[in-house]
Amino acid sequence: MTDQAESSDSKNAKKDFSTAILERKKAANRLVVDEAVNDDNSVVALHPATMEKLQLFRGDTILIKGKKRKDTVVIALADETCDEPKIRMNKVVRSNLRVRLGDVVSVHQCPDVKYGKRVHILPIDDTIEGLTGDLFDAFLKPYFLEAYRPLRKGDNFLVRGGMRSVEFKVIETDPGEYCVVAPDTEIFCEGEPVKREDEERLDEVGYDDVGGVRKQMAQIRELVELPLRHPQLFKSIGVKPPKGILLYGPPGSGKTLIARAVANETGAFFFCINGPEIMSKLAGESESNLRKAFEEAEKNAPSIIFIDEIDSIAPKREKTHGEVERRIVSQLLTLMDGLKSRAHVIVMGATNRPNSIDPALRRFGRFDREIDIGVPDEVGRLEVLGIHTKNMKLAEEVDLERISKDTHGYVGADLAALCTEAALQCIREKMDVLDLEDDTIDAEVLNSMAVTNEHFQTALGTSNPSALRETVVEVPNVSWEDIGGLENVKRELQETVQYPVEPPEKFEKFGMSPSKGVLFYGPPGCGKTLLAKAIANECQANFISVKGPELLTMWFGESEANVREIFDKARQSAPCVLFFDELDSIATQRGSSSGDAGGAADRVLNQLLTEMDGMNAKKTVFIIGATNRPDIIDPALLRPGRLDQLIYIPLPDEDSRHQIFKACLRKSPLSKDIDLRALAKHTQGFSGADVTEICQRACKYAIRENIEKDIEREKRRQENPDSMDEDVDEVPEIKPAHFEESMKYARRSVSDADIRKYQAFAQTLQQSRGFGTEFRFADTSGGATAAADPFATSNAAADDDDLYS
C-alpha cells in the first residue's frame, strides 16, 4: 500500500480507482508507530510540533485507536528526538492496539477520564508460575503508587519486579471503560488467574492477515464498510447500497478468512450460517431456521450474514430432486430480496463451485457482486508467506522471494502447509537432542532452532499445490545428465519451456507470446518420455502426465470432460507442463475411426484442439506430446499455435550412444579396461533402450558372478575354519567379459524399414514446411548466405512451385 506504488501506476494520467479505498488517508492525527525509548506502559512520546497540531499538552490523557477496533488510553509526553509524524510506544501498548512497528494509529483527545473508584485486575497464568507471596505488594503496589496511570478495560500490562515480569489483565473498571488509578482507588486482584488460551483466542484475524488478494479486498471493503459506516454516502447520491457478495475461488484461497477479517474489522454483528447446518428432518423446519437467522441479524443491525458453502443449500432448482432443497432456495431468494426490504444486513456467500448455484441468486439485488478470489500471483504469494512466517523464527538467509517464485499455483492454504512442513523439518533435525520422555526441553535447544532455506527446500519437495492433488504430480528425478546425446533437442526444449517461465519479461520486450507445444516423434526407445521427464524436473513448472488411453471412458461425453478438467487443473496451477504420452491413441485422424463408442475419439480430439488453441485466455501451459506413429496424427494438431515444434528424435549416432553408455553406467563400478567407445561403435542402429538393456544385462552377469564367489568363499571357510581370510575379494566391478557375454544377446528393437518410414515422414515435413528456404531480403549479398542454409534445396522448391502455378 505504499505511495510509490500508487504513483508509478498513475504515470499514464488516468488513475486506477479500483483500490482507492486501501490507500492511507493523510490526516494530522494519523501517526506512524515507532519503538519507544524509555519502556513505560502508560506513556507515549510525540514530537512537540505534533502535540501543538493536535492541541495537546504535556501529560494529557489521550485515546489511541489501533487495528481491529482496539483502543487504549495513555499519557502523552513531548520528546524532541521523536520524528515528525511518528508516535513512540512500547510493546505493551502496541499489543493492546494490535499494531506493529510502522503501522498507523489515530490519536484523539480524551479530556473526561475520571478517577477510578475500583478496578479489578487479574494476572495471566503462565507468567506467575512458581511465584509465591502477595502479588499486590510485590508488583501492583509499586507499579501504581503515585503514578496516576490511566487504564482501559480489557487491556493487558506487564509489570517488572524482583527478577520477574508478570502480565496482568484489567477485568473491570468503575466507572466505565477508562479510568485513572489514583491513590484512593481500590484495586482487587483476587480470583482465578486468566488462562493464556482464552487470551489468545480473542486475537482474531484482521485485514493484515489476508494476503495476496489486494484488489478483491478493496472491492469487498467498498461493499461492506462504506454502507455500514457511512450509509449517508449512498443516501446523498440516491442509490441503495449493495446487499450481497458472493466469494468464489479454489479451496484454500482464503474466502472464509476474508469474511472473518471483515467481521472483526468493521465491528458489525457477524452471523455465520454453515450450509448444511440449517437442514432439518421436519418439514418447514429448515426454512424457519433460515428466517430466524435473518431476523436475528436484523435485530442486531448493522450486521453481516455469512453463508459458507452456499452451494450446498442453494443448488440449481431444476437439477435437484429433493423437495426440501427447492423450498430452501426459494426461502433464501425471498429473504434476500423479497417484499420486505432488509436494512443494513449484508449477506456474504462463499463457495468454490459458483456454477452449481441457482441462477436466480446471482442477479443484482441478491448477490450483486461476485468476487473471484483466485490463485495468488508471485507478489501475492510473497505477502502470504510474509504473513505466515511473521511469528516463525527464520534464519537470516531465508529468501522468501525465491520461495514465492518456486511455488506456482499454490493457494494460501498450501503456503501455510509449506511453512508448517518447513518448521517440522527443522524439528526433525533436532530430534537427536530432544527426548520425548522428558517433561521440559532445554532452553538452549529451543533457542538454537531456526528455520533455514534448506528446510524450505525440503518442504517444497514434499508439498504440491492442492489444485493438483488428484492428478498427483510426481516430479521425476531425471536430470539432463541422464540423457545421452540429443544436444540440440535439449537446447530447443529449454528454449521452449524454460524461457517463458524463468525470464518472462524477455518475451514481453520482443512483443511475442511464446510457443506452447512440442511434439516428439521417432522410433520407440529413443528417450522421448525421458526428455519430458527431464524437462519437468529441470524447469520450475508443475508437471501433469496424461496417459492417452486413460482419458477414454465408457460414459458418453465423459471423455471430453476429462480432457477439459485436466486443462482446467493445469491452468489453475500455471505455469504447468502437460505431457501426453502415446498421443496417437487419442489424436488419430478424424473420420478414420468409424463407430467406436459413437466416435468418442473424434470428440476427444476436438476437445483437445479447442483447449490447446481455443478462444479462452492462455495461461502458461505447455503441451508436450510424444508418439511413435506421427503419420496417423490429425494434421489440425500439428499446425503452429498448437504443437508447433515437431522434433524428430532419431536413433542415436555413435557419439550419442557413447553418451548413453556413460549415462547408464554413471553409478556403476566399471573395470579400467572396458572401452565404451568400442561398444558404441559395435551397436550401430541400436536405440537408447537397447543400449540400456545391454548395460543392465552386463550388470546382472557381474552380480551373478559376485554372488557365486561369496558362496564359494563361505564353503571354503566352513571346510577350513582355522585359515585366515587372506584372500579378500577385490572390489566387485563389471568386467569386459560380462559385456562380451551380454553382447551375444543384444538385439535391435527397430528395423531398417521402420527407420526409413520415420525418415520419410521427417523429410516430407521438412519439404512441406520448407518453402522459404530460398527467401532472402533484397539487399543482402546473395552468395554467402545461401551456402549457410543447410536445407537449401533449390530444385525441390522449384518443383513445388509447379503445384501452385
UniProtKB/Swiss-Prot annotation:
The keyword Transport belongs to this UniProt entry's keyword annotation: no
Keyword line: ATP-binding, Cell cycle, Nucleotide-binding, Repeat
Annotated SUPFAM superfamilies: ADC-like, Cdc48 domain 2-like, P-loop containing nucleoside triphosphate hydrolases
UniProt key word RNA-binding: no
Family: Belongs to the AAA ATPase family.
PANTHER family: AAA-FAMILY ATPASE, CELL DIVISION CYCLE PROTEIN 48 HOMOLOG
Protein name: Cell division cycle protein 48 homolog
